[in-house]
Amino acid sequence: MTSILIFVAGAALLVYCAEKLVAGLVGVAGSLHVSVFLLAIVFTGIEFDDVALGVALNVENLGGVALGTVFGTAISMTGIVLALAAIISPTRVDIPRSYLVLFAASPLMMLPFVLTAPLTASDGVVLLFLFVAFIGYVAARELRSTTPVFRNAEILERIGAGGSAPAVDVVERPVDPPAPAFARVRAQAAPGRVGLALLALVGLIVAATVTSTGIDGILDEYSIQGTLFGATIATAALALEDIFLTVEPNRRGAPEIGVGNVIGSVVFGVTAKLGLILLTGGTIDVDDHVLSWHLPVLVLMTALSAYFVSTGHLRRRHGFLLLALYVAYWVVSFTVFGQVPIDGD
């Protein structure tokens, strides 16, 4: 029971520190002209808490759990986060198809590395490069494109800080003439924001250590298979922040922020997150369940989500279907793989 309490406390601290880190980073970027969608991908899509936890787990020789959080987070972003956003606040959304193609194809980037397992530091370098290339493509397109919709980036800042933004902050400009697809984040006191970001980063490191200690105890006490635990329970504890960062923007009339969070989180998770875990923690062995179960589910859920977004309207039926598939993933994972101990011979 003590291990469970340690895990819950660590996960809660991870989410809290991640929110503060996002707020600090957005504040530092306050004087820049940046696309709101690009901001969402970079500042909410990059999962600092997940990275901190994954690195801590791999350093402590819990590579199976670390790999499980990679798959689990990516699957939960569509099966929980996007699903709840569609159910709670159906909305129209306009995301370029090229972004959706990259989003749908992103899980397939893992396939060659999984097939040639174990995963190594050199694989991590390639995965990091793929994420940088993705961000570079999105940034280049956003900075030179035009769109009739101009959204105030202050919304992202308030949401990232744990607050809410009034609906009137979201405004539309006439199609003619088109407005540039970037917004100015209001200038903040940069030194204070930098200090906040650094403090939150330290908190993430401490929280990740506490959480990994709790996970280690749970695995020993309850004999749960490592990748399974990382892909389900540990992931669910870390999903609260993403649910807020996706549902609230939809409800406030800024769906680009929520969808950007989902797209950024999935692409980051299967590339840079795994890459950083490998570079800092070393080699990870891949069990058969990854190729036969977790990866196919991730490919299916991501492709289906990309299709729903491509229709231009996230509907409740889309959310219910994604949520049902995620529940089925949990049920099958525990009933089929749940009895395999992490150190089983």
Give the predicted meaning of each segment.
Residues M1-D345:
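Hydrophobic alpha-helical segments, chiefly the membrane-spanning helices
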